[in-house]
Structures are given as structure tokens and as C-alpha cells.
A protein has these predicted regions:
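Class I S-adenosyl-L-methionine-dependent methyltransferase catalytic core
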Residues: 1-70, 74-80, 84-519
């Protein structure tokens, strides 16, 4: 393996005190000082990104990557099997051991949302940092996530008559502030005033109360720098009542660093998001479960038509109780390493096989194999190397592109570019991809398809049903779906969201994995 590393490591600038500010210091900044800090942070990220290839993600160092990956082979994945409140089968996996796989695929942060069918495609995180046109909105989102604490990552509203909250029995917010200033404080905490949407009934305080306390010196700038109608503390003369956003008291522990929480400003705050990797341990679970009936076969050939961001190949390498040969495919040139003449998938798999004791030990290690193709899955049947696997695949499992939901790269070979409307994509990409998968699959084997409907504007695109119809039309038996539980998102009401479920009364979004059997 080359001495140069083709993965990024820990972004040390997140440890620098002038970058990773304390929350209370953010509240002390004037609005101009805060805007200057945002611009400086943005420049730091871009310079480091261009110099090292590392996106604005904290990450871990090489030794920690090896340590994390080394836990994958022995991890018992059958514990992921659960049922939701409706009694339906789910996969419940929030293990983070394999998260460093993302560090082998820095282009994840260059993936934008939306192709030609979107009226307003969303920028990639790379675009947000590198293009000046996004600076004003980026500054606004950083302010919302930090000074305003719009997602309540740093502070909590004082809830009226809640015994868990300091002095919540008092009648008014003014009385609460006056007692605090007289010395009745919560040790290790401070407070601020904010005008945000909140379902919590707090201690009432009026604009006139706030202005009087401010002019009397009872309130400092740090206490009022989250007030929206006062231009974030810079213009108290403009402070007015906002009926749907009453002034509330929020308390926060001192010493909190704003990162990683503030990264939500550029991960989701501007309508964009980093591409999401398929969880490697979930892939391992599916590989083991759906090849259990052929576990003792000399070699189990698993085909992944859209290899994505490496999660499924890492899952394949971590299976240690049977011999897996992973056959991956992806045309994304961002995942090619010209200096080595190999893809990032091969680089990742080789890293796992040579660096983790469970794979590299010559006496007791278990090492799986792989091969990678770099073409469209709709035309891979023309590849001479791939043709030798016709009728020899033991499992097909992938998560294909969701039409043009994500812009993985600007390559002309990307399906969202080759097929600009849904019908052409379905017939020109989805159908031939599935036809090849079915034809190349052995009898008495499974095909697993992780796909979900998408909504663009007011139009729903039926990716789920179209996939089912194509596969059953090709002779496969539909065996149902497994719900893959997704991480909960703060502040979202999922009760009426398609592909949501309840677990112990709490709503979660899920990704469906459709299961088919070739008789």
C-alpha cells in the first residue's frame, strides 16, 4: 500500500479554541464579530479541505480507525432484529463502530440534492463552503444554530412550575431574573433570553420588563444577544413582542463547545445534507441472514450494483464465518484513485484486510475477497469480466440511486444525467439493472433492494412499487420488506410521514429493504 493515505483523519482545527468556541462566548459577540468569525471559520475549512482533502467533519485518526474496524468481525449483529409496535420486522442498529468508513470517501460532502426534476436543486456542503453566494445564508444558519440555539442543542427553556427547573415556581420572568442577579443562581449555568418557537410554557416577561432590566444593568449583552426582533442584541430599541415567539428564559451549562452540534448548520440547515452511508454492520447482518442456507459453500458471490460510499463492501469484509466474494460496481469517478490505479472500494477493503487483526493474522485471520467494476449497472452485462458471473451470484443487495434525489458527481455516466425524467430512468436504468441482477442470480437465492419513494415538489415517484412490479414480472417471489430504522431527527413530526413507524410509542423514520426470492 502506498505511503500516502487516501483517507482523511481527525480535523484538528475543531480542537482550536478560536474555532470551537464556547457557547457563552458566542453570546458575548456582537453581531459583526459573529459574522467575521463565521467568515474566518469558513475560510479555515476551505483551506484545510483543499490542502488535505478532509471535509468539515471531526473524524478520528488512523489508529482509531483500525481500532473501530477491528470490532466489526466479532460483533454479534443478530441483536439488531426487533419488531415495531405494529409487530412488523425491523432492523434497529445505531452502532457507530463503522462510522470511519466515511473518511475513505471524502466526495460524500460534494454530493448535492436534486437533479433536473428539481426546481431548486440544493447545493452540496462543498458548494456551501466554497461559493461566496452561499455565505449570507450560511451565516444566518450558523447564527440560528448557535446564538439562537434553534434546535435546543445548548440550552433549555425554563418551564413554568417544573420542579426540575431552577426557580420555575416564580410568577414572572422579571422576578426570576432579579433573583438570579441577587445571587440565587444555578451553579455552573448562565441564562439568556430568546424569541423562538416553543411549545413550553415559560415564565412570562414583557418587552418593557426586558428593556427596563437592560437599562438598569441587570441584563448584559450576553443575555439579550438571542433576541430576534432586537437584531440579535444590536438594536434593543427595535425589540417588540412576537405573538408566536414570546420572550423566554433559557438556561445553559457553561463550558459547552459549539462543535460538533453546530455542524447541523451546514449538514441540514441549508436544505442540503451529506450523503448517507449504508451502515456496514446492517449490511453484515443481511449478508449473514440471507446466505445462511448456503453458509458452507466454498465461495458466496455477492453482487452490489451501486456500491455507494463503501458501507456494504466494509460489511462484506467483516463477515468471518463464511467465505464472501464481494462484486461491486459504481461509475463515480470521484471514487477512483488514479495514483494507485484502484478504486476507493478496493483501497478500503485492502485496508481492512491488512490492518485489522481478525483479517490479517496469518494463523487465525479470516479474509474475504472482492472485485470492482466502474460502469453503469444498466450496462454492466456488457463487461467481459462480469459476464463470467452469469448464473453464479448467490445474493444481490444494493441501495440504488433514488432517481435524481442525489447528485453523486458530474460524470455523464451518472444515471440522473443519462435519464433526465423518471419514466426514462425507470425504463433505461432501473429495469435493465434489475434484469441483469435476476439473470445473473442463481436459483434459490435472495435479492434485497433498498429503495424508497421520493417526493419532488408535489409529485411522488413510485420507486418502491415499480421495483416490486419489475422484479415480480421477472419471476421473483416477493417475500416482504424489512424496516431499517433511521436515526431520529430533532424537531420533526413523523406521525404522518410515509415510511414512519412507532417503537415503544416513539416515531422513527425507516428505509424499506424489499426481499425477493428466485425459485
Amino acid at each position: 500500500m502506498s505511503q500516502k493515505k487516501y483517507f482523511y483523519e481527525k480535523c484538528e482545527y475543531f480542537n482550536e479554541p478560536h474555532i470551537n468556541l464556547k457557547y457563552e462566548d458566542v453570546l458575548k459577540m456582537t453581531l459583526k464579530e459573529f459574522e467575521d468569525w463565521v467568515a474566518m471559520f469558513r475560510r479555515t475549512v476551505v483551506d484545510f479541505w483543499h490542502e488535505t482533502g478532509a471535509p468539515p467533519r471531526i473524524g478520528v485518526n488512523e489508529d482509531e480507525i483500525v481500532e473501530q474496524f477491528s470490532k466489526l468481525q466479532s460483533y454479534q449483529v443478530d441483536k439488531f432484529e426487533e419488531v415495531d409496535d405494529a409487530g412488523e420486522e425491523i432492523i434497529y442498529n445505531f452502532n457507530k463502530f463503522a462510522t470511519p468508513v466515511n473518511q475513505f470517501f471524502p466526495a460524500m460532502y460534494k454530493t448535492g440534492i436534486g437533479g433536473a426534476s428539481y426546481d431548486k436543486p440544493k447545493p452540496s456542503i462543498y458548494d456551501i463552503f466554497c461559493k461566496d453566494e452561499y455565505l449570507p445564508e450560511f451565516t444566518k444558519q450558523m447564527r440560528r444554530l448557535t446564538r439562537q440555539d434553534g434546535m435546543y442543542r445548548f440550552s433549555k427553556t425554563i418551564a413554568k412550575d417544573d420542579p426540575a427547573h431552577h426557580n420555575s415556581h416564580l410568577a414572572t420572568g422579571r422576578e426570576w431574573i432579579e433573583k438570579w442577579m441577587a445571587g440565587d443562581v444555578l451553579k455552573g449555568y448562565d441564562f439568556c433570553l430568546s424569541q423562538t418557537d416553543s411549545r413550553v410554557e415559560s415564565l412570562p416577561i414583557s418587552v418593557s420588563d426586558v428593556l427596563q432590566l437592560y437599562k438598569a444593568g441587570s441584563l448584559e449583552y450576553k443575555h439579550i444577544s438571542s433576541l430576534k426582533s432586537a437584531n440579535w442584541g444590536d438594536d434593543m430599541d427595535s425589540l417588540v413582542e412576537l405573538p408566536k415567539q414570546p420572550i423566554q428564559i433559557k438556561v445553559y451549562p457553561l463550558g459547552q463547545k459549539i462543535f460538533p452540534e453546530a455542524s447541523a448548520a451546514f449538514r441540514i440547515g441549508m436544505g442540503s445534507q451529506a450523503a448517507v452511508n449504508f451502515p456496514p454492520l446492517t449490511a453484515k447482518y443481511l449478508y449473514q441472514r440471507f446466505t445462511e442456507h448456503i453458509k458452507t459453500q466454498d465461495q458466496i458471490n455477492i453482487y452490489d450494483p451501486s456500491s455507494g460510499w463503501g458501507g456494504r463492501i466494509l460489511g462484506a469484509m467483516s463477515v468471518d464465518d463464511r467465505n464472501i466474494h464481494y462484486i461491486g460496481n459504481d461509475p463515480n469517478t470521484e471514487n477512483w484513485i488514479p495514483e494507485l490505479g484502484i478504486s476507493r472500494y478496493e483501497y478500503l477493503a485492502d485496508f481492512f484486510n491488512t490492518r485489522t487483526p481478525g483479517a490479517s493474522n496469518p494463523f487465525w485471520g479470516h479474509k474475504n475477497t472482492y472485485e470492482i467494476y466502474r460502469t453503469g449497472s444498466e450496462i454492466i452485462s456488457n463487461e467481459p469480466g462480469f459476464q463470467r458471473w452469469r448464473g453464479k451470484l448467490d445474493l444481490v443487495f444494493t441501495s440504488p440511486p433514488y432517481f435524481d434525489r442525489e447528485r453523486y458527481s458530474d460524470d455523464d455516466s451518472q444515471s440522473y444525467k443519462k435519464f433526465s425524467n423518471y419514466e426514462n430512468w425507470r425504463d433505461g436504468f432501473l429495469r435493465p439493472t434489475l434484469e441483469t441482477a435476476v439473470e445473473w442470480l442463481r436459483n434459490e437465492r435472495y435479492l434485497l433492494w433498498n429503495i424508497a419513494d421520493i417526493k419532488i415538489g408535489k409529485i411522488y415517484y413510485p420507486l418502491e412499487q415499480d421495483s416490486i412490479d419489475i422484479l415480480t414480472g421477472l419471476g421473483l417471489e416477493y417475500r416482504g420488506k424489512i424496516k431499517m430504522t433511521m436515526s431520529p431527527m430533532t424537531g420533526l413530526d413523523l406521525s404522518n410521514v410515509k415510511n414512519s413507524m412507532q417503537i415503544n410509542g416513539k416515531y422513527y423514520k425507516y428505509e424499506p429493504i424489499f426481499c425477493f426470492w428466485k425459485p
